[in-house]
């Protein structure tokens, strides 16, 4: 257990070494340092896990030093290990190591090879700080760290202005959520005098027993932070554009780890949310709406990575739904299995993109199953897990637990939303697979091979099957137990969800394996074009936010750039200057001008006297 800090220190050392190498190292040396540091962190995590189970799954705390101490305000840099943080740590370092190994192959020949691994090592260190922190402020440090790394990696190919814009968009939108999280910190410390997770849960019931509604505001702010980082409604607009980064980044940050940080935040502060059931129910509604909207958006995308981005948004929606119906174990279980099959799909999509000479439009591909059979198998298994194909995939078991939790706790409407989402998931997933790997070959794909390419894919492929579902997160005693569904009802639900998934796959085969005449006619109809455009543009949220927030903000910025306050202060000076110029013109030395001026002045004075009388 004393090795807990090494899971942060090792990737941090890798970051420092790679950063100071300034690209002078060869790709092999950079890969050894970048991949090796994360691999060692994963190995340390394995030792920690063995020790954790050997000691009866007891919560362990490792104080490192006092971070801040001002009067009564004391924040320690303390790490905590329990079943929840161990699960997250295993996902971050384990799946992270596999993705780093794959990236050492994928990024070969790219400019900034060592810079890439420096950023990803810093990300792993920040993510580990986030999941091991024993207090909200230390978690916030890791939270901001992963946000910075996300920005750097989305804009990795910074010479293209579009990538820079995508990075800035992700940074700004997620910062909105971070502001909400900061407000939550202020409220909770002001009310409870501590930010330690355990102490907050212990003090909250007595402190808020008198009906103080500040706890509701605090949990709403926590939810605001969670939806920003986890790309949920209404702060979901950044994730699809984040696909501008290298594909291993999409797998590491925007599928398996960082985007699930919001789920972890709510799970870690579950004691506070249980005291505000209205906010907890809102969490479930946010998840249900997001999973449906993202599912329809994924159905019409043409970019292979954007399909997977919207599917990520949708699957995190399932996790939020699970949290909202108090199916805590199911949420974390799905977080883990999702990391397996979504990392597999993203890495396999990277192989497709390289094999097709960096083409990402699925309609310009086709017939690739013969050229890259291993990648095709990865897509089949990963797609089946994403679609929750019954019995043989990890996704089936975790998603069914979520639906069972919703049904057992009386949230039938959310369960129905989950079933509709399951149908949409299987439909858009196998639409992508059938278009890319079946039909007529439209592009000559070259073979992709190599140990560092194939080994991570094979490991993730195995974990995406029912084998991954055998890994049960040790959450007993950390999160409240989920209400269990009666055996008969559970069997009915499993059959129903299985049928829904299979029907979605069969419908996808009928629509996209043949000549696609029906799909074409629907797409070319007036309603089809309207809905297709609407869904393709993610329900118009970007357009709405541009009109409501971006354009007014830019208008205000344009106005402030010209310093209106200073201009107003100059008005008296300008008027005085014009008056002075007028008086100078009147002093011209002509007698007739003076007589005329006096006459006009006299007439004006007489007129005023007559009017005022």
UniProtKB/Swiss-Prot annotation:
<dbReference type="GO" id="GO:0042773">
    <property type="term" value="P:ATP synthesis coupled electron transport"/>
</dbReference>
<keyword id="KW-0520">NAD</keyword>
<feature type="topological domain" description="Periplasmic">
    <location>
        <begin position="608"/>
        <end position="613"/>
    </location>
</feature>
<feature type="transmembrane region" description="Helical">
    <location>
        <begin position="590"/>
        <end position="607"/>
    </location>
</feature>
<feature type="transmembrane region" description="Helical">
    <location>
        <begin position="495"/>
        <end position="514"/>
    </location>
</feature>
<dbReference type="InterPro" id="IPR003945">
    <property type="entry name" value="NU5C-like"/>
</dbReference>
<keyword id="KW-0472">Membrane</keyword>
<keyword id="KW-0997">Cell inner membrane</keyword>
<keyword id="KW-0874">Quinone</keyword>
<dbReference type="GO" id="GO:0048038">
    <property type="term" value="F:quinone binding"/>
</dbReference>
<dbReference type="GO" id="GO:0008137">
    <property type="term" value="F:NADH dehydrogenase (ubiquinone) activity"/>
</dbReference>
<keyword id="KW-1278">Translocase</keyword>
<feature type="transmembrane region" description="Helical">
    <location>
        <begin position="116"/>
        <end position="133"/>
    </location>
</feature>
<feature type="topological domain" description="Periplasmic">
    <location>
        <begin position="53"/>
        <end position="74"/>
    </location>
</feature>
<comment type="subunit">
    <text>Composed of 13 different subunits. Subunits NuoA, H, J, K, L, M, N constitute the membrane sector of the complex.</text>
</comment>
<dbReference type="InterPro" id="IPR018393">
    <property type="entry name" value="NADHpl_OxRdtase_5_subgr"/>
</dbReference>
<dbReference type="Pfam" id="PF00361">
    <property type="entry name" value="Proton_antipo_M"/>
</dbReference>
<keyword id="KW-1003">Cell membrane</keyword>
<dbReference type="GO" id="GO:0030964">
    <property type="term" value="C:NADH dehydrogenase complex"/>
</dbReference>
<feature type="transmembrane region" description="Helical">
    <location>
        <begin position="7"/>
        <end position="23"/>
    </location>
</feature>
<feature type="transmembrane region" description="Helical">
    <location>
        <begin position="339"/>
        <end position="356"/>
    </location>
</feature>
<feature type="topological domain" description="Periplasmic">
    <location>
        <begin position="398"/>
        <end position="413"/>
    </location>
</feature>
<feature type="topological domain" description="Cytoplasmic">
    <location>
        <begin position="24"/>
        <end position="31"/>
    </location>
</feature>
<keyword id="KW-0830">Ubiquinone</keyword>
<feature type="topological domain" description="Cytoplasmic">
    <location>
        <begin position="515"/>
        <end position="589"/>
    </location>
</feature>
<protein>
    <recommendedName>
        <fullName>NADH-quinone oxidoreductase subunit L</fullName>
        <ecNumber>7.1.1.-</ecNumber>
    </recommendedName>
</protein>
<feature type="topological domain" description="Cytoplasmic">
    <location>
        <begin position="301"/>
        <end position="306"/>
    </location>
</feature>
<feature type="transmembrane region" description="Helical">
    <location>
        <begin position="32"/>
        <end position="52"/>
    </location>
</feature>
<feature type="topological domain" description="Cytoplasmic">
    <location>
        <begin position="229"/>
        <end position="248"/>
    </location>
</feature>
<feature type="transmembrane region" description="Helical">
    <location>
        <begin position="75"/>
        <end position="99"/>
    </location>
</feature>
<feature type="topological domain" description="Periplasmic">
    <location>
        <begin position="473"/>
        <end position="494"/>
    </location>
</feature>
<feature type="topological domain" description="Cytoplasmic">
    <location>
        <begin position="357"/>
        <end position="373"/>
    </location>
</feature>
<feature type="transmembrane region" description="Helical">
    <location>
        <begin position="249"/>
        <end position="267"/>
    </location>
</feature>
<dbReference type="Pfam" id="PF00662">
    <property type="entry name" value="Proton_antipo_N"/>
</dbReference>
<dbReference type="GO" id="GO:0005886">
    <property type="term" value="C:plasma membrane"/>
</dbReference>
<feature type="topological domain" description="Periplasmic">
    <location>
        <begin position="326"/>
        <end position="338"/>
    </location>
</feature>
<dbReference type="GO" id="GO:0022904">
    <property type="term" value="P:respiratory electron transport chain"/>
</dbReference>
<feature type="transmembrane region" description="Helical">
    <location>
        <begin position="414"/>
        <end position="437"/>
    </location>
</feature>
<feature type="topological domain" description="Cytoplasmic">
    <location>
        <begin position="100"/>
        <end position="115"/>
    </location>
</feature>
<feature type="transmembrane region" description="Helical">
    <location>
        <begin position="282"/>
        <end position="300"/>
    </location>
</feature>
<feature type="transmembrane region" description="Helical">
    <location>
        <begin position="307"/>
        <end position="325"/>
    </location>
</feature>
<dbReference type="GO" id="GO:0015990">
    <property type="term" value="P:electron transport coupled proton transport"/>
</dbReference>
